[in-house]
Amino acid sequence: AYHRRPYIYPEDAYSLAVVKLGSGSNLLGYYMYHGGTNPEGIDELNETQRTPSTNYNDMPVKNYDFQAPLGEFGQSYPHYYTLRKLHLFMQDFGELLAPMEAQFPCPQDIKKGDDSFLRYAIREKDGSGFIFINNYERLQPLTTKKNVHLEACGVKLPRITVPAGTVCIFPVNVEGIRYATAQLIAKRDGKVYMEQIPGIPTTICMADGKVLRGVKARGTETPVYKNIYLLDSHAASHLFLDEAPAQPIIEDVAYTKVREATADYNITIGRNKVAEAPRDEHFADAAIYTIDIPDCNREGRLLRIDYRGDVARLYCNGHLIADNFYNGRPMLYGLWRLPEDCRQLELRVIPLQKDMPVYFPREADTTPGEEIVRIIVE
């Protein structure tokens, strides 16, 4: 929203999803899993403070990216890959997890920033279960938890140290594994894939009595024991993907500042008692840039505008095609959406002001004014 511009980290989405599963949920759902673009012709449905049905928030006119795992133009954000681990897990083990009851050994009246104990939950049924650990809280640094003793289904795990920021799921009496300080990811063609949790030594105790300690990740080609494969976090989040690691072709894009901003936007407080977003008429006073589109293959290419400002709008032949509330991240646009004959775009940027009644994340440069840092095609 205009007045509140959070910067979503991969751990934010992942920890929330793990906590939901550990608390008894069986269906992972997302408001936006793939970001979108608002369609033409229904301006009366734009989300603003003047529309109570949309919770009194001023949203961009076109952009509906929502920092979703897959962005507005299909780009993969880091949390797309971290969440894949849960999606694979639920696909292969969801039927086992679904009837398991949730148990909460730690206190449930948790206050924000409470760092006095490790947050975890257990789900179990008929002697099998999972331990869900969350030692992460958004914008609240939690400490490393030492000498942690976990027990589920009557099985005691070895004492471990849980590093700050750790979010993971340990199996108990699942797939021939009595317990493991590693996370189950998937089972395919008789092979069981697990993730080594950074900072936690991997112990795998098998139901046949075999105990493997200090196990190192070996990837998808070499098992650590029989049909058990241990992967590092990157390999686990990219498991079964056939993405070819392409080297991006980056081209700098020429741009020209046509006009300085002629007046500051007079920020008003809307009916919901928060800052109200600029309307169409306010962009008449914005700084104006022209952007020359390079002669290149546009398919799958993104225009990336690194800028500093309050709000930016992008136009093609006088027609609004994209907008952005600045939060420290670049503004993006899919070049394949442009008409073939489009060779130049217009960018209008309303400057930042001192002491704006707007929440900006720490990644944002809130120095008053506006500037284009760099524009590229990638």
What are these regions (language model features)?
Residues 170, 291, 330-338:
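Exposed aromatic-hydrophobic patches
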Residues 277-288, 323-328:
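Extracellular beta-rich ligand/substrate-recognition surface
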Residues 295-316, 324-325, 347-348:
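Aromatic-lined ligand-binding clefts that engage carbohydrates, nucleic acids, or primary amines
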Residues 355-378:
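Exposed low-complexity, polar/acidic, P/S/T/G-rich flexible segments that act as propeptides
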